[in-house]
Regions:
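An acidic- and aromatic-residue-enriched active-site/binding cleft used to recognize and process polar
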Residues: 17-19, 105-106
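Glycine/Thr-rich phosphate-binding loops of Rossmann-like dinucleotide-binding domains
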Residues: 22
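C-terminal lobe and adjacent flexible extensions of AdoMet/dcAdoMet transferase-like proteins
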Residues: 31-189
Length: 189
């Protein structure tokens, strides 16, 4: 559909979970995060039954139909989603006349698209999160008093009292959820 509906030199931009990261994380168990009142914030449950999610262009039986059930408290219901193998995705897009691009952005948002936030051509939210202190040095909006200063809270870890109870809940599980995401910019050639 996008092959027919995007003009030459037009863009296809998006964001979704990196299926390989989710696949690896779900090898041991499903993922769930609840707050200090035992209210579920999110969960990701494995619904597929494959042992390997490696992309092989000669045999793609393991690439399609790998469902996960995703619950987000803010949405209030379970939504089925599918694992996206980014090596397959790139291969498929290139076969259909698209190439991954990293636009040359100047000014305010240029730091987000720096090479140290990109993995194999895809924007990597995990790297953006890990690079937030560096980004904040250059972006006043991330600094104290800035419009996006609260985004820096995602770097806080849980603090415990001496008896091991939670003093202040950190953002490790939200950081994990965010780190599963990749963003991409394809241009039709």
């Amino acid at each position: 559909n996008i092959k027919d509906n995007i003009a030459p030199k037009g863009y296809f931009i998006g964001c979704c979970y990196d299926g390989n990261k989710i696949f690896e994380a779900l090898k041991d168990s499903n993922i769930e995060f609840s707050d200090t009142h035992s209210e579920k914030i999110y969960s990701i449950d494995k619904k597929y039954d494959i042992d390997d999610f490696t992309f092989n262009p000669d045999n793609m039986d393991n690439i399609f139909g790998n469902t996960i059930d995703v619950y987000m408290e803010s949405i209030g219901q379970i939504i089925p989603e599918y694992l996206v193998n980014f090596k397959f995705f790139r291969h498929y897009m290139e076969e259909n006349g698209f190439k991954l691009v990293s636009p040359k952005v100047k000014g305010k948002y240029s730091n987000l698209l720096k090479q140290n936030n990109i993995t194999e051509g895809f924007g990597d939210f995990e790297k953006v999160i890990n690079n937030l202190p560096e980004l904040a040095e250059q972006d006043k909006e991330l600094q104290k008093g800035g419009y996006y200063n609260e985004a820096m809270n995602i770097l806080k870890n849980t603090e415990l009292n001496d008896d091991g109870t939670i003093k202040e809940l950190g953002y490790e599980k939200l950081r994990l959820l965010s780190s599963f995401n990749n963003y991409f910019i394809f241009q039709k050639v």
